[in-house]
């Protein structure tokens, strides 16, 4: 399954982000804690270059806590300050502000030394669609400023938002890359809802999600769908889930589309518990002594 989705406003956003960088003190890169690397646009590294960066793992309430700690350690080893948050619940907002102050301290100290009065920190928020940028901005600003939704592509225009007297945020539309050459990355993004369902084959996505859970979270899969054992044959697994949850067509036939929608809706809604779809080890990174590494 090759996924292509690159609306015109995303291409425009890349140009605008590049233009705005000279105004920015720090970049807040928002990723999905359930897939911290797959939810990063590789173009971001090219665009941001040498700006101080804070990597924020959002939706930590839906991710595997043990793996979230490993990912924070991973980003720190790469030289990026990193924290985990739950923007929906407003958790981690103070940590973001504190981390940004640390990242711009050297620059602002130089400004003061030159007799320049410190101004508000100017931060750029970047990320792919549906990682929670608008929700984060609204929580930081304590106002319903940015449009929010669980559909990718909700934020379509750039805007400056004041966060108290100490910070100004520039929101940007989510920037996806033109084509997912890595099929696994595309499937992971599709599973968490970062890509519009309307352009996907949901059965393919559901097959990936079920096989992933079978391998990594089998007990949750069995408990949620009342399975004594998980059938090896994927069609039999769909049949068992569809029958258990009443996803039927006329004559008692299993409705595979409805079953696929059910599985993905429940997974995205947290009904199957906290889970993370990738680990640093998969990318050749060994993260040691994670428990000793404290978050910022």
UniProtKB/Swiss-Prot annotation:
Location of this chain's protein in the cell: Cytoplasm
PROSITE patterns according to UniProt: G_CP (PS51721)
One cellular-component annotation, GO: cytoplasm
Protein name: Ribosome biogenesis GTPase A
One annotated GO biological process: translation
GO molecular function, one term: GTP binding
Taxonomic lineage from the root: Bacteria, Bacillati, Bacillota, Bacilli, Bacillales
Source organism: Bacillus cereus (strain ATCC 14579 / DSM 31 / CCUG 7414 / JCM 2152 / NBRC 15305 / NCIMB 9373 / NCTC 2599 / NRRL B-3711)
The protein's role, per its UniProt record: Essential protein that is required for a late step of 50S ribosomal subunit assembly. Has GTPase activity that is stimulated by interaction with the immature 50S ribosome subunit. Binds to the 23S rRNA. Required for the association of ribosomal proteins rplP and rpmA with the large subunit.
Annotated InterPro entries: G_CP_dom, GTP-bd, GTP-bd_ortho_bundle_sf, GTP-bd_ribosome_bgen, GTPase_MTG1, P-loop_NTPase
Keywords for this protein: Cytoplasm, GTP-binding, Hydrolase, Nucleotide-binding, Ribosome biogenesis, RNA-binding
Family recorded in the similarity comment: Belongs to the TRAFAC class YlqF/YawG GTPase family. MTG1 subfamily.
Pfam families registered for this protein in UniProt: MMR_HSR1
Membrane-spanning segments: none
Residue intervals of the CP-type G domain: 14-178
UniProt key word GTP-binding: yes
Main location (coarse class): cytoplasm
SUBUNIT field: Interacts with ctc. Interacts with the immature 50S ribosome subunit. 2 molecules of rbgA bind to one 50S subunit.
Binding site for GTP: 58-61, 130-135, 174
């Amino acid at each position: 399954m090759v996924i292509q989705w690159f609306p015109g406003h995303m291409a425009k956003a890349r140009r605008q982000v590049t233009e705005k960088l000279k105004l920015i003190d720090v970049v807040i890169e928002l990723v999905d804690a359930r897939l911290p690397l797959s939810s990063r646009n590789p173009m971001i590294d090219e665009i941001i270059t040498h700006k101080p960066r804070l990597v924020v793992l959002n939706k930590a309430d839906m991710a595997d806590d043990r793996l979230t700690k490993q990912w924070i350690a991973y980003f720190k080893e790469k030289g990026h300050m990193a924290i985990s948050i739950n923007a929906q619940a407003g958790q981690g907002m103070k940590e973001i502000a504190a981390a940004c102050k640390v990242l711009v301290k050297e620059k602002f100290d130089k400004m003061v030394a030159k007799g320049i009065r410190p101004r508000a920190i100017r931060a750029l928020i970047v990320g792919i669609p549906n990682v929670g940028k608008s929700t984060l901005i609204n929580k930081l600003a304590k106002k319903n400023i940015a449009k929010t939704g669980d559909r990718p592509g909700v934020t379509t225009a750039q805007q400056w938002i004041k966060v108290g007297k100490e910070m100004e945020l520039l929101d940007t539309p989510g920037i996806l890359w033109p084509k997912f050459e890595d099929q696994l990355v595309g499937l992971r993004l599709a599973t968490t809802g970062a890509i519009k369902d309307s352009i996907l084959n949901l059965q393919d996505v559901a097959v990936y999600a079920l096989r992933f859970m079978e391998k990594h979270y089998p007990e949750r899969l069995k408990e949620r769908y009342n399975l004594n054992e998980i059938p090896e044959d994927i069609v039999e697994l769909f049949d068992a889930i569809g029958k258990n949850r009443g996803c039927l067509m006329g004559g008692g036939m299993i409705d595979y589309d409805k079953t696929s929608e059910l599985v993905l809706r429940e997974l995205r809604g947290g009904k199957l518990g906290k889970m993370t779809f990738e680990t640093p080890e998969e990318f050749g990174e060994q993260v040691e002594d994670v428990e000793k590494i404290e978050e910022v």
